[in-house]
A protein has these predicted regions:
Chain B
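Bacterial N-terminal signal peptides
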Residues: 11-22
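Bacterial N-terminal signal peptides that target proteins for export
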Residues: 2-13
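Exported/periplasmic ABC-transporter solute-binding proteins
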Residues: 27-55, 59-62, 66-76, 83-86, ...
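Active-site phosphate-binding/coordination module
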Residues: 101
Length: 356, 254, 227
């Protein structure tokens, strides 16, 4: 299933001009700075922003286009708003059942118990929203959105209104949801952290326009985008658990360009794990170092070089089919005589697991 | 050729004019009269004649007799009171708020059953018995003598009970007239003085019930303050000129 | 008991009038209040001013215009007659119509405020949960606006209890049909029947006070719960 969207929305000083295709599976993050139009785009897809001349196709249904506009209550969506928006006059159970009660017959898919389990809110069912913490309210909101068995889940910066502690409390739930859900998820955020942990695909938005779309690992490594040029430039690499070295407490993770050894707790074999590698943690050598403390070294080809400043360079490498960013000094690039096509070895000093 | 007026005569003339002028000013008085609503137009004409004759000013306040009574009891500053009944002036006299001996009947109210439309009320008032109307307006019998009279007439004709739901009560005789006049009630018991004008035929149709059917609506007036102008006014009202005016407006006089 | 039959009838008529007026206003006023709270039409202020008009108009003015409108020569009365019905002056129905206009802002304004207080978000949420506009209205807006409904009902009722000027103009003071307590009290005073006036007035005073206490009490309770 794919999703095709074209919107042109003018809101006074701000206008959204988006033309994009969204994957029908996995989590697509809509990422960009505040005020760039992410929420407007999400609301347009949900049908909450009425606009003329827009186009939206979801799978084989046309939700908007050719003069038609399907109102939000006829769209099979689940929407989680930024501020917890539970119905104050209903308890948690009735909140969750609200959408469930309104879907007809055959669409009445599996019961909501797994969702309640997944989000850990079983013990809150009889409480009123005013008795819950912000994090608990958002979890209920997510359960409520999922309860109506939507074909698509839309989340508008669901963690933005929470403090760090609550954020950390919910992220694991979101991550397990990511693993369990079979419907496409659109996740709006301005937080790099969240995006890097949760997104499969990325839509980069700035000033009301789509800057880039693609798998998250690829977009984060594109040197033509501003995000790869700040101090936190990183690579996101999908790996699979291959084994565990009990003696040294090292997890072995395989990816298309080689394998990583990372100090971590054991995880079941075959499990996918996402790795975050900061560009400043990646150094390069022309020859494979033997006696070195760095465990993670793999061959790579220099793909692109971009000068950041007088002193710094960003180098885009391909470790097999996987892009990897490296931030080194300009002097080193000259000393090593680096140019596109060169074979080098990438040395990754540390990598963080994004999913424990 | 110059005509010289001797200085002495000039002075005398000026003095005489001044005295007369000043005398006129000094003697010009202002009196306030509370008047029953139904007598409004008649009293207006009478007051105008009085003012023209004497140079005094007559300020008139119209309203229901009950309201005036309550106000006067509570100290309202009227010199005289022209009521629509006998009871209130008598009460004021008994309570010492009016000058005793000043009470007199200034007009006798006449009640008519009237409709602004020409064929509604016949000369015998049989429309009361045929009941061919939705609403009939009267003044509130509890509050207004004209209303009480209307009730008496309806009872005399034996229709009071059966017409209960169709009898619309105005707060005063004027509101009763307004109900009939506007057509909201097809007909009503109104003061004859409301429809009788000097030198004009009565519009619409009406029936004048015989005086025997209802208690006389003697309208009495009483002096409230010992005031020369007020006394003069009262005397004027009882004079011939005033009586003619009063009758031309549909009242009887003694 | 000092009440005579006519006074009791007046009380009954008054209560009947207040109940009917309140019910009609709740039914008719709710969609208007809803529209007023949602609409962004730039001429909305005209409608709001119209609704608020009975707040500032002397009741006698309202009664006067109603008398003309309901009379045989007026637009409503004439229409009624043309349709084979009766003009509405001096009828209980006419009083109900007058009271509906008279008490309109007391019902519509609290409802409008309560609907506005609900805000857009809960309704958007409900829309994403498959609720149609009518469904959203009944399952979200109305329950969340409950304090507003209570206030509107009580104020509309209490205000109609005290109606005088309008009834004076178009009622005709027919005992058993259009004689309400306020007119009865007026008449008692005019006729110097102070005892009866005291009893009727006292009754109305206590009833009104109890009703107002209820409104303020309930609103206090609701604002505490939602805090």
């Amino acid at each position: 299933m794919t999703i095709e969207a074209r919107f042109h929305i003018d809101r006074g000083e701000f206008s959204l001009n988006a033309d994009l295709a969204i994957a029908g599976k996995g989590v697509t993050a809509v990422f960009g700075p505040s005020g760039c139009g992410k929420t407007t785009l999400l609301r347009a897809i949900a049908g909450l922003e009425y606009n003329e001349d827009g186009y939206l196709r979801v799978g084989d249904q046309i939700w908007q286009g050719d003069g038609q506009f399907l109102p939000p209550h006829k769209r099979s969506i689940g929407y989680v708003f930024q501020e917890p928006s539970l119905f104050a006059h209903l308890n948690v159970q009735r909140n969750i059942e609200y959408g469930l009660k309104r879907i007809k017959g055959a669409a009445h898919k599996a019961s909501i118990d797994p969702t309640i389990q997944l989000l850990g809110i079983g013990h809150l069912l009889n409480r009123r929203p005013s008795q819950l913490s912000g994090g608990e309210q958002q979890r209920v909101a997510i359960a409520r959105a999922l309860a109506s068995s939507p074909d698509m889940l839309l989340l508008d910066e669901p963690l933005a209104a929470l403090d760090d502690r609550l954020k950390q409390e919910i992220l694991p739930y979101l991550e397990s949801m990511h693993r369990e859900l079979e419907i496409p998820v659109l996740y709006v955020s301005h937080s790099r952290d969240e995006v890097v942990r949760l997104a499969d695909h990325l839509v980069l938005l700035d000033n009301g326009r789509v800057q880039a779309t693609g798998p998250v690992g690829e977009v984060f490594s594109r040197l033509d985008l501003a995000i790869t040029h700040d101090a936190d430039a990183e690579s996101v690499i999908e790996t699979t658990v291959a084994g565990y070295d009990e003696a040294f407490g090292l997890l072995r993770l395989d990816f298309a360009g080689g394998h990583f050894s990372v100090a971590a707790s054991p995880l079941p074999a075959g499990r996918t794990v996402r790795l975050q590698v900061l560009a400043r943690d990646v150094s390069l050598t022309l020859a494979h170092q033997q006696a070195t403390s760095i465990l993670n070294i793999f061959p790579a080809t220099v793909d692109q070089l971009v000068q950041e400043s007088d002193a710094q360079m960003t180098v885009r490498l391909m470790a097999g089919p996987v892009p990897l960013l490296s931030r080194i000094t300009r002097k080193s690039t000259e000393d090593l005589g680096l140019k596109t096509g060169d074979q080098v070895y990438a040395q990754v000093k540390s990598a963080s697991l994004l999913i424990p | 050729m110059e005509v010289l007026i001797p200085k002495r005569i000039q002075l005398s003339l000026i003095l005489a004019l001044t005295v007369t002028f000043c005398a006129g000013q000094v003697l010009a008085d202002e009196i306030r009269i509370a008047v029953a609503s139904n007598f409004a137009e008649a009293i207006k004409e009478i007051a105008e004649r009085f003012e023209a004759k004497t140079g005094h000013e007559v300020i008139l306040a119209y309203g229901s007799t009950g309201k005036h009574y309550a106000q006067i009891k509570n100290g309202a500053p009227f010199e005289a009171f022209f009521a629509a009944d006998v009871e209130r002036p008598k009460l004021l006299e008994d309570e010492g708020r009016a000058l005793s001996g000043s009470r007199f009947t200034y007009a006798v109210g006449k009640l008519v059953l009237w409709s602004p439309k020409p064929d509604v009320v016949d000369a015998n008032g049989s429309v009361l018995n045929t009941g061919d109307f939705r609403f009939i307006a009267i003044a509130n019998p509890k509050l207004a003598p004209y209303g009480k009279a209307a009730k008496e007439i309806l009872q005399a004709r034996g229709v009071w009970d059966q017409l209960q739901k169709r009898i619309v009560r105005g707060e005063n005789i004027n509101q009763a007239f307004q109900f009939a006049h506007s057509g909201n009630a097809e007909l009503g018991f109104v003061a004859f003085s409301k429809v009788k004008r000097p030198n004009r035929a009565v519009p619409g149709s009406f029936w004048q019930p015989p005086q025997s059917l209802y208690s006389a609506i003697d309208q009495q007036a009483v002096l409230l303050k010992s005031n020369a102008t007020a006394r003069a006014f009262m005397a004027f009202v009882q004079g011939e000129e005033a009586c003619t005016i009063i009758q031309s407006y549909g009242y009887g006089t003694l | 008991m000092i009440f005579d039959k006519q006074d009791l009838t007046a009380l009954f008529i008054t209560l009947k009038l207040a109940v009917m007026t309140t019910v009609i206003l709740l039914i008719v006023g709710t969609p208007i209040a809803w529209w007023l709270s949602r609409s962004r039409w730039r001429f909305k202020f005209l409608v709001e001013a119209l609704v608020a008009l009975p707040l500032v108009l002397p009741p006698t003015v309202l009664g006067f215009y109603l008398l003309i409108a309901l009379g045989p020569h007026g637009p409503i009365g004439g229409l009624m007659e043309a349709l084979g019905g009766r003009p509405l002056a001096f009828t209980f129905t006419g009083l109900v119509i007058g009271s509906v206009f008279y008490s309109m802002p007391f019902v519509i304004q609290p409802l409008q405020n309560a609907f506005t207080a609900v805000g857009r978000r809960p309704l958007e949420v409900a829309a994403t949960l498959r609720a149609s506009p009518l469904d959203r209205f009944f399952t979200i807006a109305v329950p969340m606006a409950k304090p507003g409904f209570i206030t509107a009902a009580v104020l509309g009722f209490a205000h109609t209890l005290g109606e005088f000027g309008v009834v004076l103009m178009i009622g005709g003071n027919i005992p058993g049909t259009t004689q309400v307590v306020s007119i009865a009290v007026y008449d008692h005073v005019e006729a110097l029947e102070y005892t009866q006036a005291h009893w009727l007035s006292g009754c109305l005073l206590i009833l009104s006070f109890v009703l107002l206490m209820t409104v303020y009490g309930i609103n206090r309770r609701f604002s505490v719960v939602q805090a």
